[in-house]
Swiss-Prot record:
Keywords linked to the UniProt accession: Cell membrane, Conjugation, Glycoprotein, Membrane, Transmembrane, Transmembrane helix
Extracellular face of the membrane: 1-39, 133-308, 425-586
Function recorded in the entry: Involved in cell fusion during mating by stabilizing the plasma membrane fusion event.
GO BP: plasma membrane fusion involved in cytogamy
Name of the protein this chain belongs to: Plasma membrane fusion protein PRM1
Organism: Yarrowia lipolytica (strain CLIB 122 / E 150) (Yeast)
Family statement drawn from the similarity comment of this UniProt entry: Belongs to the PRM1 family.
Cytoplasmic side: 61-111, 330-403, 608-690
InterPro entries, per database record: PRM1
Glycosylation sites: N162, N221, N265, N273, N456, N485
Protein's UniProt keywords contain ATP-binding: no
The UniProt record lists the keyword Lipid metabolism: no
Length: 690
């Protein structure tokens, strides 16, 4: 019964690779079972483990960074909240300063105004009293002197007039009587003439014509009475002393000042609640940590690292598994090559083979791919040059050198892959830095807005306080100066009325009025002008808060610096990890550097040997060991050995394996397994014997 394909393969595997009592080395089956432990797969696995350890290190640092970031963000929120509340704290302090300054200013202003009012009041009263007293005395003396002169003059005039009248009246009376008789005679003549013309009798004109009777009886009794001197004496006694005016003016002057003093004292006793009127910006609270979602960001970072690690390790594991295939294929080819080599060596006189050629064969068997590379990359036209170039490539790709090269290459690969994981962390960092990068601008905007609002409100308050001071406090000064001016006008009018009441219609009226105007009225008008100037300038201007004084550049800079605290934690981690990665890169590059240094030494050696004609290589002889006897001289004509074809047993059929008696491999002791060469029968080498 024919065997199935699986059974045939199993039979072949067991017969070709099962250990026997004649075999002490691992055969093909054992060797293939270790192909997964090849240097490529192990290197990739080590790189995967390194990446996993790198990720675990990053995860641990990220956990610490998350905790630090949350604490730093909370501290940053508190710090930024305080910075955003700078207008509140500034306004609180400034409002206290402004309120205290205004209170002290108003209190000092009231006290100063009270002192000024008291001083001005007493000065005005003193000036008015001085003027009134001085010019009252002056007017009194002038009037008394004038009246005394007038009285003395009037006495002499009265005495002269009285004496003259008593002497002249009789003589005048005689003349007047004669004149009256003449006039009456003329009147009778006119009556007679009329009677003649009209025919009336004299009796008919009785009652119609009055006759002249001139008498000086009244003049006899005329005399200037002595009462005229009495009236002049009374004028002297009636000269005003202006005591009433003085008292009235003093009362009028004191009244407004007393009112102002009373109001100011009441204001001074009542403290100003300026602080309650000043506005204070509210405290601000920054809450960007909640918007930053720090745990979520770090979770995304860890998730990204895990995903990247899984992808990279999966690719490395797949590549490691894939590398098993060419290694297994290479191992199988090496086994086959050993079998072919054994067949070849069975036809060669080993004793006559050169030692170097045999080592060349062993090297080609053990390092097949290196042999392929050195044959492909060999240079030179002469044999010794090609041998030297092949030696160079074999030297720099020898296992020890190749191990150093692979360590450097795997180190660079690990560096690049770890750098890829780190780039994932860097990209995730952007989502954490975006919320905090705007903190500086937000803080500046909030501070500027709140300070601007506070500045406007405070300036409005200062405007109102300025108006209040000018209207209520200094308004009293304006009112008092106006009252003083009114009082002075009243005083001047009262004084003029007093002068008019005494000297009106007298010769002294103009003189007294002129003296009063010159010496009193003009002085008081100057005082009134001074009071008017005080009224015009009795106001204050409080300074305003300027926006330029509230600089926010330092605030913006400090806020921007504090806004980087959270992201700086990850940035420091990245910087530290990058430093470690570059240290690994430097180690890998150092390995490559050593390998390149050895390559350079080998190259120098080859160049030196290529110039040396006394090499061990003989240009007249070729060293070939490609299934041909290399012991013969190249100048001797080649004699082909008889060709022996190895019998081809039936595939996978144990019962068709040649018997030991007919098996051509049986005579060689090195042949342990008679059935081990059947697999190569499809391409069995041609054995040549010289």
């Amino acid at each position: 019964m024919a065997m199935s394909l699986a059974s045939q393969i199993k039979l072949w595997w067991n017969t070709q690779n099962s250990p026997t009592e004649h075999s002490s080395i691992p055969l093909l089956k054992a060797r293939l079972s270790q192909t997964w432990l090849n240097k490529w797969t192990i290197g990739l696995l080590l790189v995967s483990i390194k990446l996993w350890m790198f990720k675990m290190s990053l995860s641990g640092q990220l956990d610490g960074a998350e905790s630090n970031s949350e604490r730093s963000c909370s501290a940053l929120e508190r710090s930024v909240s305080k910075m955003m509340s700078i207008p509140h704290y500034t306004a609180t302090g400034m409002n206290h300063v402004i309120a205290t300054a205004i209170q002290k200013f108003v209190s000092g202003l009231i006290k100063m105004v009270l002192l000024i009012i008291t001083g001005v009041q007493e000065l005005l009263i003193f000036a008015v009293n001085m003027l009134i007293s001085t010019y009252t005395c002056l007017i009194t003396l002038v009037v008394q002197g004038a009246v005394s002169l007038a009285v003395d003059t009037s006495k002499h005039v009265i005495s002269f007039v009285n004496d003259t009248i008593s002497t002249v009246v009789p003589e005048i009376e005689k003349g007047l009587n004669g004149l009256a008789d003449g006039l009456n005679t003329a009147t009778n003549a006119f009556v007679d003439l009329g009677n003649l013309i009209t025919g009336k009798q004299a009796e008919e004109y009785t009652g119609q014509i009055d006759f002249v009777k001139l008498q000086l009886d009244g003049l006899k009794n005329v005399s200037i009475p002595a009462s005229v001197n009495e009236k002049l004496d009374s004028v002297k006694d009636k000269v005003p002393d202006f005591e009433t005016v003085k008292n009235e003016i003093e009362s009028l002057i004191r009244k407004p000042f007393q009112t102002i003093s009373k109001s100011m004292n009441e204001t001074l006793a009542t403290p100003l609640n300026v602080s309650d009127s000043l506005k204070v910006p509210a405290l601000k609270s920054a809450q960007f940590c909640k918007d930053a979602n720090i745990p979520e960001v770090y979770a995304k970072l860890n998730s990204g690292l895990n995903t990247g690690l899984k992808v990279i390790i999966s690719l490395l594991l797949i590549l490691a598994l894939i590398m098993i295939v060419p290694v297994a294929w290479s191992e199988w080819r090496l086994w086959r090559y050993h079998e072919e080599l054994w067949v070849e060596q069975s036809t060669v006189d080993v004793k006559q083979e050169k030692r170097h050629a045999f080592h060349t064969v062993l090297f080609q068997a053990q390092h097949k791919y290196v042999t392929m590379v050195k044959q492909k990359l060999a240079w030179g036209k002469k044999l010794y040059q090609r041998n030297l170039s092949q030696w160079y490539w074999a030297y720099i790709l020898y296992p020890y050198m190749l191990t150093l090269l692979l360590v450097g290459l795997f180190g660079i690969l690990a560096f690049l892959l770890q750098l890829g994981l780190l780039s994932i962390l860097k990209s995730g960092l952007q989502s954490l830095t975006v919320p905090t990068s705007e903190v500086g601008a937000d803080v500046t905007e909030t501070v500027v807005r709140e300070i601007e609002t506070w500045k406007n409100d405070t300036n409005l308050f200062l405007n109102s306080q300025e108006t209040h001071i000018n209207k209520n406090l200094l308004g009293w000064v304006v009112d008092s100066t106006s009252t003083v001016n009114t009082t002075l006008s009243t005083f001047i009018d009262t004084m003029n009325n007093g002068i008019d009441s005494v000297f009106k219609d007298t010769p002294l009226h103009g003189a007294v009025q002129g003296v009063t105007k010159c010496l009193v009225t003009l002085k008081l008008q100057k005082v009134a002008d001074g009071m008017g100037w005080v009224s015009d300038n009795a106001h204050v201007t409080l300074p305003r808060i300027d926006k330029e004084l509230m600089s926010h550049q330092d605030i913006e800079q400090e806020a921007s610096e504090k806004a980087d605290y959270v992201s700086d934690g990850i940035a420091r981690i990245i910087k530290t990890v990058e430093k470690l990665l570059f240290t690994e890169l430097y180690i890998a590059l150092a390995c490559l550097g050593i390998w390149l240094f050895m390559c350079l030494i080998a190259l120098v050696y080859v160049l030196i040997k290529s110039r040396d004609r006394t090499t061990n290589f003989e240009p007249s002889r070729e060293l070939k060991f490609d299934m041909v006897d290399t012991s013969r001289d190249i100048n001797v004509p080649r004699v082909l050995p008889p060709q022996i074809t190895i019998p081809k047993p039936a595939l996978f059929m144990r019962n068709h394996i040649p018997s030991p008696a007919t098996d051509p491999f049986e005579e060689y002791p090195i042949r342990r397994n008679k059935s081990s060469s059947w697999l190569f029968n499809l391409k069995s080498p041609v054995l040549r014997k010289s």
